[in-house]
Amino acid sequence: MNNRVHQGHFARKRFGQNFLNDQFVIDSIVSAIHPVPGEAVVEIGPGLGALTEPVAARMDHMTVIELDRDLADRLASHPQLKDKLTIHQEDAMKINFSELAELAGQPLRVFGNLPYNISTPLMFHLFSYTSAIRDMHFMLQKEVVNRLVAGPNSKAYGRLTVMAQYYCNVIPVLEVPPTAFTPAPKVDSAVVRLIPHVNTPNPVGDVRMLSRITTQAFNQRRKTVRNSLGDLFTPEQLIELGIDPILRAENISVAQYCKLANWLSAQSTPQE
C-alpha cells in the first residue's frame, strides 16, 4: 500500500502535503477555532477538507486558499462544500489579506494545516497583514511552535520569536503526533493560536528597523551583541539603552529589541 495516497489523492512532496486524519485532533482544532456564522473565515491549505468540512458546517460561507489544482477542483465539486466556498487556487504567499478583509468588511480569522516547508516565510507574510487579521490558528512543526512561544535565554528563541511576539500574543493549543497524518511526517506537530495585538505592548516606529536588527543579531547568534551589532551601536550606546554588550542575541528581550529599533530609527531621522 502506498502511504502517500489518501482518499484517492497522491500527497505531493513539493507541496509539503501531509493530510490530517485523526478525528480527536480535528475536533480539538475546530473547538479551538470556534467559528461563528457571519465571521470572515479563511483556510490556508485545506487539502482534502479534514478541517474545512467541520468548520464549513458551522458557517454559511468561508474562503479557502489552495495551491494544488487537483485539490482545489475536488473542493469545487464537493457536494457539501461547493456552495459555501470561495476558492483561491493560488500561492498564499501572493495573497493580499488586507484585500480579503476589505471585501469581507471585517478582520479575518485565518487557520490552516500549513505545509512545513513554507510555514516560516508564510508566517512573516501574514505578520505584515495583522491589522486585517483577528486571529490565526495553525498546525505547524512542533519545533516551529516552540520557537514562536520561546522566551529569552533559550536555544529556541530567535528572530521568528521576536517578530511573532512583536505582532501577536502567541498561545500553544495542542500537540499532535505523526500518526494523526497520512503520510505520517517525520516530526511532531503542534497547534498554535496567534492573536494580533490591538495595542502593541512595545510600539516600533519602523518595523523594518526591528527586522534588520534581529536578522543581523540572530545571523551571528554565537557572537556578543558588541560584535554582531557593532556597526549599528557602540558599547556605550548599548549600555545607555540598558543592554550589556557582552550579551548574545538570545539574551535580549522583545522589549529591548524594540527599544534598539526605535533608538536607531531616531538616529536615522534627519533632525529639523
Curated annotation (Swiss-Prot):
<dbReference type="InterPro" id="IPR023165">
    <property type="entry name" value="rRNA_Ade_diMease-like_C"/>
</dbReference>
<keyword id="KW-0808">Transferase</keyword>
<feature type="binding site">
    <location>
        <position position="66"/>
    </location>
    <ligand>
        <name>S-adenosyl-L-methionine</name>
    </ligand>
</feature>
<dbReference type="InterPro" id="IPR001737">
    <property type="entry name" value="KsgA/Erm"/>
</dbReference>
<feature type="binding site">
    <location>
        <position position="45"/>
    </location>
    <ligand>
        <name>S-adenosyl-L-methionine</name>
    </ligand>
</feature>
<dbReference type="GO" id="GO:0005829">
    <property type="term" value="C:cytosol"/>
</dbReference>
<protein>
    <recommendedName>
        <fullName>Ribosomal RNA small subunit methyltransferase A</fullName>
        <ecNumber>2.1.1.182</ecNumber>
    </recommendedName>
</protein>
<feature type="binding site">
    <location>
        <position position="18"/>
    </location>
    <ligand>
        <name>S-adenosyl-L-methionine</name>
    </ligand>
</feature>
<dbReference type="InterPro" id="IPR011530">
    <property type="entry name" value="rRNA_adenine_dimethylase"/>
</dbReference>
<keyword id="KW-0963">Cytoplasm</keyword>
<dbReference type="InterPro" id="IPR029063">
    <property type="entry name" value="SAM-dependent_MTases_sf"/>
</dbReference>
<keyword id="KW-0489">Methyltransferase</keyword>
<keyword id="KW-0949">S-adenosyl-L-methionine</keyword>
<dbReference type="InterPro" id="IPR020598">
    <property type="entry name" value="rRNA_Ade_methylase_Trfase_N"/>
</dbReference>
<feature type="binding site">
    <location>
        <position position="91"/>
    </location>
    <ligand>
        <name>S-adenosyl-L-methionine</name>
    </ligand>
</feature>
<dbReference type="GO" id="GO:0052908">
    <property type="term" value="F:16S rRNA (adenine(1518)-N(6)/adenine(1519)-N(6))-dimethyltransferase activity"/>
</dbReference>
<feature type="binding site">
    <location>
        <position position="20"/>
    </location>
    <ligand>
        <name>S-adenosyl-L-methionine</name>
    </ligand>
</feature>
<dbReference type="GO" id="GO:0003723">
    <property type="term" value="F:RNA binding"/>
</dbReference>
<feature type="binding site">
    <location>
        <position position="113"/>
    </location>
    <ligand>
        <name>S-adenosyl-L-methionine</name>
    </ligand>
</feature>
<comment type="function">
    <text>Specifically dimethylates two adjacent adenosines (A1518 and A1519) in the loop of a conserved hairpin near the 3'-end of 16S rRNA in the 30S particle. May play a critical role in biogenesis of 30S subunits.</text>
</comment>
<dbReference type="Pfam" id="PF00398">
    <property type="entry name" value="RrnaAD"/>
</dbReference>
<dbReference type="InterPro" id="IPR020596">
    <property type="entry name" value="rRNA_Ade_Mease_Trfase_CS"/>
</dbReference>
<comment type="similarity">
    <text>Belongs to the class I-like SAM-binding methyltransferase superfamily. rRNA adenine N(6)-methyltransferase family. RsmA subfamily.</text>
</comment>
<keyword id="KW-0698">rRNA processing</keyword>
<keyword id="KW-0694">RNA-binding</keyword>
